[in-house]
């Protein structure tokens, strides 16, 4: 794919600067979700096993170029030591004499964590001088933070031009999964796009209709498309001012040979709350006081049938109000169908986005998907067809 991995590098005795995403939630000094740290473990273990000395570069929160104690990475040292099962040292800067001294003194089997890169205001400006200061700490640069790859920052883009560079295991897995999904996918390809607003996913929809065979639209977005087709949506969440744009997307999809799938029947309630009284109606029968909160059983059957004839699935966004029972039914059932097909070796399934990950976890389907991205903005920008600076830098370095 044009970029190098850890397998292409001689790591013996080398100081390996690893750009990581350890932007984890902390409450009262306690890490409440260590998923991002756990996902780094293969990279750190492989570097240590090959005789390399990992030096971690990371941002934490948005300090705006100021040193803020509550955003210091030093508080993560105990959590990292437990995860990596080795000694983790800490330097109170990511450049300068103290950081250079700590990097030079790092012993085999140890890990060095550098202070928050965003304590330097120039980090987010892709400052080459800051990148040069970081590069002095290592012999090799390894980017394992796909979640930050859509940002051209000193620690993600500029530094890759200054050292031999490669992708870490997490970055490698993410890029390989995404290449399978949209780069050179097995066809037919289906995309599921849900969520509240068409306006926030215009570029995404525009890119997908050129690349996929079926585009399943759910959530509040689907209501806007129903409005564009002249169908009633009552008091449902819908962007009525976007109906002309939605109509244009429908026309472009038809011209591109992409079949857009909208709900043929809907689950309607008068209140947006769990277990609200509801009814299943055809998509042309939503009453004035009704709110569409989920796709109906006929719609779900159609989605399952499309999954069965697909070879690749990309999923971003729920099909309904998944946070409210029973309006999570279509999302859960579709997710479990995709999981079963993946388990049977009949489907490559890739999903990403905050609500998507939450919905798939809630359904119990997440563990069977081929790949689930926790990268958020980077995953969306990749789906939109944009060039990610952090990835482009690795390709150029390769």
Swiss-Prot record:
Substrate binds at residues 21-23, 36, 59-62, 118, 151. It holds the Pfam family PGK. Monomer. It is found in: Cytoplasm. Keywords: ATP-binding, Cytoplasm, Glycolysis, Kinase, Nucleotide-binding, Transferase. One of its GO terms (molecular function) is ADP binding. This is Phosphoglycerate kinase. Its EC number is 2.7.2.3. It catalyses: (2R)-3-phosphoglycerate + ATP = (2R)-3-phospho-glyceroyl phosphate + ADP. It comes from Ruegeria pomeroyi (strain ATCC 700808 / DSM 15171 / DSS-3) (Silicibacter pomeroyi). The gene is pgk. HAMAP family: Phosphoglyc_kinase. Pathway: Carbohydrate degradation; glycolysis; pyruvate from D-glyceraldehyde 3-phosphate: step 2/5. It is an enzyme of class 2 (transferase). GO terms for cellular component: cytosol. ATP binds at residues 201, 323, 353-356. InterPro entries: Phosphoglycerate_kinase (IPR001576), Phosphoglycerate_kinase_CS (IPR015911), Phosphoglycerate_kinase_N (IPR015824), Phosphoglycerate_kinase_sf (IPR036043).
């Amino acid at each position: 794919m044009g970029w190098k991995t850890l397998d292409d590098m001689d790591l013996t005795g080398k100081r390996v600067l690893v750009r990581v995403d350890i932007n984890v939630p902390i409450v009262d000094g306690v890490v409440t979700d260590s998923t991002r740290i756990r996902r780094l473990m293969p990279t750190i273990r492989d570097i240590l096993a090959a005789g390399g000395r990992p030096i971690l570069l990371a941002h934490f929160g948005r300090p705006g170029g100021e040193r803020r104690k509550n955003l210091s990475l030093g508080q993560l040292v105990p959590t990292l030591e437990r995860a990596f099962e080795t000694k983790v040292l800490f330097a109170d800067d990511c450049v300068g004499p103290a950081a250079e001294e700590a990097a030079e003194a790092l012993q085999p089997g140890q890990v060095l964590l550098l202070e928050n890169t965003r304590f330097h205001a120039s980090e987010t400006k892709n400052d080459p001088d800051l990148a040069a200061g970081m590069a002095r700490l290592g012999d090799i640069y390894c980017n394992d933070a796909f979640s930050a790859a859509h940002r051209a920052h000193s620690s993600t883009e500029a530094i890759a031009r200054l050292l031999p560079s490669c992708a870490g295991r997490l970055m490698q897995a993410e890029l390989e999964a995404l290449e399978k999904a949209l780069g050179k996918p097995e066809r037919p390809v289906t995309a599921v796009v849900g969520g509240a607003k068409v306006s926030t996913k215009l570029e995404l929809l525009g890119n997908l209709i050129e690349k996929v065979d079926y585009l399943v639209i759910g959530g509040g977005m689907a209501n806007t498309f129903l409005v564009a087709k002249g169908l009633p949506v009552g008091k449902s969440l819908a962007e009525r001012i976007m109906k002309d744009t939605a109509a244009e997307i429908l026309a472009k999809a038809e011209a591109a040979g992409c079949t857009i799938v909208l709900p043929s029947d809907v689950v309607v309630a008068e209140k947006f709350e769990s277990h609200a009284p509801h009814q299943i109606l055809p998509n042309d029968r939503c009453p004035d006081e009704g709110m569409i909160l989920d796709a109906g059983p006929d719609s779900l059957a159609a989605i399952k049938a499309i999954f069965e004839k697909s070879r690749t699935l990309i999923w971003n966004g729920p099909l309904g109000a998944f946070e409210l029972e029973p309006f999570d039914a279509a999302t859960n059932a579709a997710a479990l169908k995709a999981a079963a097909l993946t388990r049977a070796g009949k489907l490559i399934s890739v999903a990403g986005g905050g609500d998507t990950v939450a919905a798939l976890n809630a359904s119990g389907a997440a563990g069977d998907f081929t790949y689930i991205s926790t990268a958020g903005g980077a995953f969306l920008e990749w789906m939109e067809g944009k060039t990610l600076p952090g990835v482009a830098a690795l390709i150029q370095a390769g």
